[in-house]
Amino acid sequence: MAKKSMIARDVKRKKTVERYAAKRAALMAAFNAAEDPMDRLEIHRKIQALPRNSARIRVRNRCWATGKPRGVYRDFGLCRNQLRERAHKGELPGVVKSSW
């Protein structure tokens, strides 16, 4: 199990990303559309003025059951250990052991 403080930090980052998503997307679109270097510089400064944690890249993909940050399968949101346990118990619909 991951530290509760790390999980809480990640939850806080997700909320910050949500809050600033529209503003960041608008600034990025303007930045990519601007051709004048001075305009691009000004828009870049506005992007840099946003909180660091408002960037999507800062959010860590974590297992929703244990909070582990590594070995997380995107399709399920579970770490590899939990995925294996739950698949064996039959708790994941459509997941079967492979055999050939």
Curated annotation (Swiss-Prot):
Keywords, in A-Z order: Ribonucleoprotein, Ribosomal protein, RNA-binding, rRNA-binding
Coiled-coil ranges (or none): none
InterPro entries attached to this UniProt entry: Ribosomal_uS14, Ribosomal_uS14_bac/plastid, Ribosomal_uS14_CS
GO cellular component: cytoplasm; small ribosomal subunit
Pfam short name (any one): Ribosomal_S14
Domain of life: Bacteria
One Gene Ontology MF term: structural constituent of ribosome
One GO biological process term: translation
Signal peptide: none
Matching PANTHER family: 30S RIBOSOMAL PROTEIN S14, SMALL RIBOSOMAL SUBUNIT PROTEIN US14M
Functional note: Binds 16S rRNA, required for the assembly of 30S particles and may also be responsible for determining the conformation of the 16S rRNA at the A site.
The family this protein is said to belong to: Belongs to the universal ribosomal protein uS14 family.
Subunit annotation: Part of the 30S ribosomal subunit. Contacts proteins S3 and S10.
Listed name of the protein: Small ribosomal subunit protein uS14
Organism in which the protein naturally occurs: Synechococcus sp. (strain CC9605)
